[in-house]
Amino acid sequence: MNFICPKCKGALTVTDGGTAKCPLGHSYDRAKEGYYNLLLSSVGGTHGDNREMVMARRAFLDTGAYMPLARRVAELAAEHTPDGGLLLDCGCGEGFYTHTINEIAKNANKTLHIHGFDISKAAVRLAAKRDRDLSLAVASSYDLPIAD
């Protein structure tokens, strides 16, 4: 995991219990689905798409209508990212493309460190359920919690 603390920008390390902590003591629990909520916001409420919107998008994408596009994007991503390289999916939504990239890379015997970010907690939750191999976080693409 290459995540950094959204408060102090220190490196996050994961404890045996799954909590991500920075050197200054800020901590972030891993959700049961396997993602972290690293969104700092003074505004309460829902950010990004709500559960109903995300579920509707997943239902449509799972029909396969966009699978040829997803496969081609995944092939290009795997082809142009070096083995062991880092790939960021900013605005990963419910994980359709992120998961496809991961699967195409695995089928090509290529290891990619894939991080997905979305401002929608509902979307990231579904992405984490779709693919437990991904490193996912609720975060804003305007302030990505990732090390340079």
Regions found by a protein language model. Give the residues of each.
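Class I SAM-dependent methyltransferase Rossmann-like catalytic core
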Residues: 51-72
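Glycine-rich helix-loop-beta junction characteristic of Rossmann-like nucleotide cofactor-binding loops
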Residues: 74-82, 144-145
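Short, glycine- and charge-enriched coil/turn segments that flank and shape catalytic ligand pockets
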Residues: 16-17, 78-85, 106-109
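N-terminal auxiliary segments of SAM/dcSAM-dependent transferases
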Residues: 1-47
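Generic hydrophobic alpha-helical segments
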Residues: 69, 73-77, 97, 101
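Class I SAM-dependent methyltransferase SAM/SAH-binding core
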Residues: 86-88, 94-143
